[in-house]
Amino acid sequence: TPEHQRYVELFIVVDHGM
């Protein structure tokens, strides 16, 4: 689902921020 993809992208951004 598109919503899941959005969460995945957000998680990646947070991971890179860490």
UniProtKB/Swiss-Prot annotation:
Keyword presence, Cytoplasm: no
Q: How is it modified after translation?
A: Contains 3 disulfide bonds.
This protein's record includes keyword Metal-binding: yes
Q: Which cofactor does it need?
A: Zn(2+)
Q: Which GO terms describe its molecular function?
A: metal ion binding; metallopeptidase activity; toxin activity
Record's cofactor remark: Binds 1 zinc ion per subunit.
Q: Where is it chiefly localized? A: secreted
Q: In its UniProt record, which GO terms are filed under biological process?
A: proteolysis
Subunit composition? Answer: Monomer.
| UniProt function note | Snake venom metalloproteinase that impairs hemostasis in the envenomed animal.
**What is the recorded name of this protein?**
Snake venom metalloproteinase Bfon25
